[in-house]
Amino acid sequence: MFCIQCEQTIRTPAGNGCSYSQGMCGKLAATSDLQDLLIYILQGVSAYAEKARAFGIIVPAIDTFVPKAFFATLTNVNFDDERIMAYTQQAYGYRAQLQAAYESACKAQGQAIETLIPAASLVLASVKEEMLALAAQALPNRGKEEVNEDIMGLRLLCLYGLKGAAAYMEHARVLDQTDSEVAAKFHEIMAFLGSDSVDADKLFATAMEIGQLNYRVMAMLDEGETQAFGHPEPTQVNTVAVKGKAILVSGHDMKDLELILQQTEGKGINVFTHGEMLPALAYPELKKYPHLVGNYGSAWQNQQKEFANFPGAVVMTSNCIIDPNVGDYADRIFTRSIVGWPGVTHIVGDDFSAVIDKALSLEGFAYDEIPHHITIGFARNALMAAAPAVVENVKNGSIKHFFLVGGCDGDKAERSYFTDIAKAAPKDSIIMTLGCGKYKFNKLAFGDINGIPRLLDIGQCNDAYSAIQLAIALSEVFECEINELPLSLVLSWFEQKAIVILLTLLSLGVKNIRTGPSAPAFLTPNLLKVLEDKFGLRSTTTVEQDLNAILNVA
């Protein structure tokens, strides 16, 4: 086992990364190794997909399968060895299909058949123990003895960034948003990463290409969500219990939430969102359901306590899932799509009757709690509608600075930094937030500036796209570059979606971003120095020190 993809990975003087019997996320060594083997086989699939495309051979099912299966290896997504092995076998079959098509096309046109990356020729075993034996050559740090740490760090930056982009590609696909050019670029990068390049310049350029790719994917996802559910609107959301039977929907999948709402109509079941599903309550086509009654709980890392206390059924539509046996709710949590946990019921297809039956069999909430509301829904359309008022308040001096404080949440005590910097931001500043990092402060009262709320909840992590659009609009109005705006980005990271959003921002030329609570363990001091010199990227320090630097206070 070797895994270094998330913020909670082991860090010691002897080296970084989880490499023992179990990772810090709870992932067993065997599961980690099987995931690495899956990725390796997927790289082989992409290698043949890229070559086959040159002959006009495109298989849409494969184009969507590869990022979906890659998503299954994200932090806190799928811990089920049997499911991971099934993905690997399916990938192996797809590789054979593309290989045959490619070689046939070469012969038909009199072209030489190329020898591709090693992952394109690995013979897969069918027995778990034999698959685990193969995994040694698929580890993400393979060949570490032959390359320096900087090259390895760049490889991992690209691998984990592309993994984040794959997750967003799958979210977009669920909403019928696919793009053949995006798929082609994805396969190209996936195959390149399978080549174990030692070219630092090429690897760095690839990291920027991944950021550009993800910018397009975020636009696709934004289009898919707004076409399906309308544009988010500023909305008051209840955050406490409502009497009655209940279902809790966590993850990121709005389509699954819609299906659950449709299938629970008239059944006397209240539906709550959790974690990154909170923004769903601002979409017109979702909030129209009266039994979508609010958001329960907070960010992913608190789920073992929150799900244990929730008196209903729970559906995990995507990341992040952690051990449901700790809170003794494994018999009433259900997984969907790429999510998996051994022994937990997995919903295949679009029939949620098992979830509904479980909810009806449970006690539900006994009484209504005193209502407490927060305001959400300041995504792209709402931000653009507010832009003229924002511009006027900037011009008259009422608004002097903008902060984007958000990203991933997590357990570390140091993450209180993000609460503290939001609270300490000057009263003449606007605070935008997104991702589950918002839970560090989204129930606090920040007031308003001439009717404009100081705290603007933009949405999920992928809604960084909305913040980018606002920044572009403001830069056009004020006839300046984005980096010249009074805008500061303070981002918390935990896993691979956050990595690709960072790459997206860097690829767009956004500078002077602060990230925390710690730098990714796979980035060496040399790489961090390059990112600081090129982009002004830096780690968070103290709230006082960072605010003074941001606001140019001596």
Curated annotation (Swiss-Prot):
Cofactor detail note: Binds 1 [2Fe-2S] cluster.
Gene Ontology MF terms in the entry: 2 iron, 2 sulfur cluster binding; hydroxylamine reductase activity; metal ion binding; peroxidase activity
Cofactor(s) named in the record: [2Fe-2S] cluster; hybrid [4Fe-2O-2S] cluster
Chief location category: cytoplasm
Residues where [2Fe-2S] cluster binds: 3, 6, 18, 25
PANTHER family referenced in this protein's UniProt entry, alphabetically: HYDROXYLAMINE REDUCTASE (PTHR30109:SF0)
Family according to the record: Belongs to the HCP family.
Name this protein carries in UniProt: Hydroxylamine reductase
Native species: Shewanella loihica (strain ATCC BAA-1088 / PV-4)
